[in-house]
Swiss-Prot record:
Protein name: Cytochrome b
Reported effect, residue 218 to M: In strain: Isolate I539
Gene: MT-CYB
Membrane topology: Multi-pass membrane protein
InterPro entries in UniProt: Cyt_b/b6_C (IPR005798), Cyt_b/b6_C_sf (IPR036150), Cyt_b/b6_N (IPR005797), Cytb/b6-like_sf (IPR027387), Cytochrome_b (IPR030689), Cytochrome_b_C_euk/bac (IPR048260), Cytochrome_b_N_euk/bac (IPR048259), Di-haem_cyt_TM (IPR016174)
Organism of this sequence: Ctenomys porteousi
Keyword Heme listed: yes
Length: 379
C-alpha cells in the first residue's frame, strides 16, 4: 500500500485539529480569540527566548542587561517591547475568551473549562514573575508585596514566604528562581493548551445558539483558517502600533528606576491586567480575608458549571442574563480603575462596593435570574 501524506501520524493529528475539523457553521468572531491566544503564546515564547539570550538574572546586572538589550542589541528594543506589550494583548484576549465562554455557556464543557481556569492561573503566575525580572522599583516592590501575601497562611505562612524568597527578603536568590520559573512555565502552559484542545475536540466547539450543531458542520479549513488569519492581522496591527508609537503606555514609569530596597514607591500597583484582582484584595481590611478573596475571585470561574440553572445553554436568547453579564463587565472595569488608585476616600468605599457586587452578581443574581427566565418561558 502506498503511503499517503495523510496516513502519517503527525500529519493526521494536524489534519484532524486544524484542517478537516468539523466546526459549527455559525460561530462568531468571538471564537477567534482561542487562535489569537495561540499566536500570542508563540510570539511570547519566541521574543522571550531572544530576550533570555541577553538577560542576566543577577540583582547587580539585571536592570543594566535590560537597558543593554534596548540600546545595544540589534532590534532589542523591538523584541523587549513586543514581549511586554504582547503580554498585555495576551490578557486582553484571555479576558475576551473567558467572557465569550460565560456568555455562550461554553463552561458546560467542564473538562475544557477547568483546564482553562488552571491555564489562567499559570499565565497569571508567569506574567507576575516576568514583571519582576527587569528589577526596577515596581518589580522589586511588587514582588515583595505579592509574595508577602503568603505569610497570611496560618502556621506555615512566614516560613513559606522565606522559602520562596530564598532568604529573609526579596534578593538575588528570588530573582534567579523567578527567572527559572518564568522560563519553564510557558512550556508547561503550551502542554496544558494541547490538553485544553484535546478536551475541546472530544466534544466539538460550542456555538452562539448553544444548541447541538452536529447537523450543520463545515470543515475548519478554509472557512475558519481565513477568519483566524484576519483576526491575527488585526492583532498584529494593534500590537505593532502599540510597540512603535506608545511602547510604555501600559507600563509603570517607576520601573525605569533601578530597584532600591530602602525607598518604597508611593503607590505600589501591579500591571493593568491584575488591577481588578488587586482591588478585591485591598478592599478587605483583614490580610487573610483579602488573600482568600483574591484567590476566590479567579477560582469562582470553576463554579460556573455548578451555578448554571438555566434550561438554555447560551445567553443569546436571555435578555435579563445579558444585562447581568454586561453589569459584570462594567463592574470589572470599575475594579480595574480602583486598583490603580491610591488607598484613600472615596476609592476605598467604591472598591468595597464593587468587590461585593462582583461576587453578588456571579453567586446570586446570575443563577436566580436564570431560574426566573425558566419560569417566564414556562419551562
Amino acid at each position: 500500500m502506498t503511503n499517503t501524506p495523510q496516513s502519517h501520524p503527525l500529519i493526521k493529528i494536524v489534519n484532524h485539529s486544524f484542517i478537516d475539523l468539523p466546526a459549527p457553521s455559525n460561530i462568531s468572531a468571538w471564537s477567534n480569540f482561542g487562535s489569537l491566544l495561540g499566536v500570542c503564546l508563540g510570539l511570547q515564547l519566541l521574543t522571550g527566548l531572544f530576550l533570555a539570550m541577553h538577560y542576566t538574572a543577577d540583582t547587580t546586572t539585571a536592570f543594566s542587561s535590560v537597558t543593554h538589550i534596548c540600546r545595544d542589541v540589534n532590534y532589542g528594543w523591538l523584541i523587549r517591547y513586543m514581549h511586554a506589550n504582547g503580554a498585555s494583548m495576551f490578557f486582553i484576549f484571555l479576558y475576551f475568551h473567558i467572557g465569550r465562554g460565560i456568555y455562550y455557556g461554553s463552561y458546560t464543557f467542564m473538562d475544557t473549562w477547568n483546564i482553562g481556569v488552571l491555564l489562567l492561573f499559570a499565565v497569571m503566575a508567569t506574567a507576575f514573575m516576568g514583571y519582576v525580572l527587569p528589577w526596577g522599583q515596581m518589580s522589586f516592590w511588587g514582588a515583595t508585596v505579592i509574595t508577602n501575601l503568603l505569610s497570611a497562611i496560618p502556621y506555615i505562612g512566614p516560613t513559606l514566604v522565606e522559602w520562596i524568597w530564598g532568604g529573609f527578603s526579596v534578593d538575588k536568590a528570588t530573582l534567579t528562581r523567578f527567572f527559572a520559573f518564568h522560563f519553564i512555565l510557558p512550556f508547561i502552559i503550551t502542554a496544558m493548551v494541547m490538553i485544553h484542545l484535546l478536551f475541546l475536540h472530544e466534544t466539538g466547539s460550542n456555538n452562539p445558539s448553544g444548541m447541538n450543531s452536529d447537523s450543520d458542520k463545515i470543515p475548519f479549513h478554509p472557512y475558519y483558517t481565513i477568519k483566524d488569519i484576519l483576526g491575527i492581522l488585526f492583532m498584529m496591527i494593534t500590537l505593532m502600533s502599540l510597540v512603535m508609537f506608545t511602547p510604555d503606555l501600559l507600563g509603570d514609569p517607576d520601573n525605569y528606576t533601578p530597584a532600591n530596597p530602602l525607598n518604597t514607591p508611593p503607590h505600589i500597583k501591579p500591571e493593568w491586567y491584575f488591577l481588578f484582582a488587586y482591588a478585591i484584595l485591598r478592599s478587605i481590611p483583614n490580610k487573610l480575608g483579602g488573600v482568600l478573596a483574591l484567590v476566590f475571585s479567579i477560582l469562582i470561574l470553576m463554579l460556573f458549571p455548578i451555578l448554571h440553572s438555566s434550561k438554555q445553554r447560551s445567553m443569546s436568547f436571555r435578555p435579563l442574563s445579558q444585562c447581568l453579564m454586561w453589569m459584570l463587565v462594567a463592574n470589572l472595569l470599575i475594579l480595574t480603575w480602583i486598583g490603580g488608585q491610591p488607598v484613600e476616600h472615596p476609592f476605598i468605599t467604591i472598591g468595597q462596593l464593587a468587590s461585593v457586587t462582583y461576587f453578588f452578581i456571579i453567586l446570586i443574581l446570575m443563577p436566580s435570574t436564570a431560574l426566573m427566565e425558566n419560569k417566564l418561558l414556562k419551562w
